[in-house]
């Protein structure tokens, strides 16, 4: 062991590089303080915490190791940046040992947390998607579910306002600040339907909040799905797997990869939600294990007509 002193990091012990039992990452003050607090919190729960137990077969040491109801659980308190590739590699190591792991995030992850990182660290707690944080100021675990959202809106329940915001943002994105993706989708939409993006069918609007799953707003993917199924004749039939593959193919490169869950976990919910809405809008129907295209969704000549329709349904 060597004693390190630093101007910006507090004095701490670290393992020498090159030894046969691995070494800890350089630790910030928050990481050291939070790890101590998590250890004490686990003690209060009688989880028999141990600090940095080394597993030689995978060359990893979790920040804390717990024993909960006879089961071993690893805890990683992550304050520094961590790539998806490194996260997957660490989780694979724990998977080999059949040890579940809790990834608890520090305060740096509260700032400008984009979809990519949300999906990367999404875990399941009590059958719900969550991100876990540790608040060192209050010395407590924070279970955060606030990331459910609708495209282009901070609201979750006011469907009329969400729809208005989505229509206005689609106009803005298409005509004023088009990204390459929006520009291509706009041209395809105009070529195939003669309409602008803001005039898309009502079923394209995600008015029910969903957990992040893509690097683009879900409404862009949903419009793409409608354009894709319009290539098929009425009464075309898809098997369940064929239908899922069709929807996954749309904006394929924009699906985000989770680091703590099986790849299909979040995507499956997004696909099922849209499938159910397409059934509710009578675009498709289910017959045994097949989905049948029975109606082409209506594009609007005036986006304001959509607002009136939502008013009547509200």
Residue spans for each PLM region:
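Interdomain/boundary linker segments immediately adjacent to catalytic/signaling cores
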Residues: 1-29, 292-305
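Conserved catalytic cores of phosphodiester-cleaving nucleases, focusing on short active-site segments
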Residues: 38, 63-83, 94, 103
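Non-catalytic C-terminal interaction segments of nucleic acid-processing enzymes
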Residues: 123-314
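Catalytic cores of nucleic-acid endonucleases
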Residues: 79-131
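Beta-rich catalytic cores
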Residues: 60
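Acidic-basic catalytic patches of nuclease active cores, encompassing PD-(D/E)XK
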Residues: 13-51, 67-69
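Short, solvent-exposed loop/turn elements at beta->coil junctions and helix N-caps
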Residues: 52-57
């Amino acid at each position: 062991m060597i004693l390190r002193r630093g101007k910006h990091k507090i004095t701490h012990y670290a393992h020498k590089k090159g030894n046969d039992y691995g070494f800890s990452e350089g630790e910030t003050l928050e990481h050291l303080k939070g790890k101590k607090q998590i250890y004490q919190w686990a003690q209060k729960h009688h989880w028999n915490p141990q600090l940095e137990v080394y597993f030689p077969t995978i060359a990893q040491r979790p920040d804390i190791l717990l024993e909960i109801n006879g089961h071993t659980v690893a805890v990683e308190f992550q304050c520094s940046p961590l790539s998806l590739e490194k996260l997957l590699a660490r989780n694979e190591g724990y998977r080999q040992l059949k040890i579940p792991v809790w990834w608890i995030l520090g305060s740096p992850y509260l700032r400008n947390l984009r979809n990519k990182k949300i999906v990367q660290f999404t875990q399941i707690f009590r059958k719900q998607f969550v991100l876990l944080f540790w608040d060192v100021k209050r010395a407590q675990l924070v279970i955060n579910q606030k990331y459910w959202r609708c495209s282009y809106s901070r609201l979750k329940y006011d469907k009329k306002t969400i729809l208005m915001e989505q229509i206005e943002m689609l106009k803005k994105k298409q005509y004023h600040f088009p990204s390459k993706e929006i520009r291509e989708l706009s041209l395809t939409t105009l070529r195939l339907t003669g309409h602008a993006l803001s005039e898309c069918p009502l079923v394209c609007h995600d008015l029910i909040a969903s957990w992040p799953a893509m690097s683009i707003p879900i409404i862009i993917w949903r419009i793409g799905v409608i354009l894709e199924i319009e290539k098929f004749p009425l009464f075309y039939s898809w098997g369940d797997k064929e239908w899922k593959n069709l929807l996954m193919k749309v904006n394929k490169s924009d699906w985000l990869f989770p680091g703590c869950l099986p790849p299909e976990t979040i995507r499956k919910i997004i696909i099922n939600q849209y499938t159910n809405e397409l059934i509710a809008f009578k675009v498709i129907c289910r017959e045994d294990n097949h989905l049948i295209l029975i109606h082409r969704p209506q594009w609007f000549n005036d986006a304001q007509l959509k607002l009136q329709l939502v008013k009547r349904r509200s």
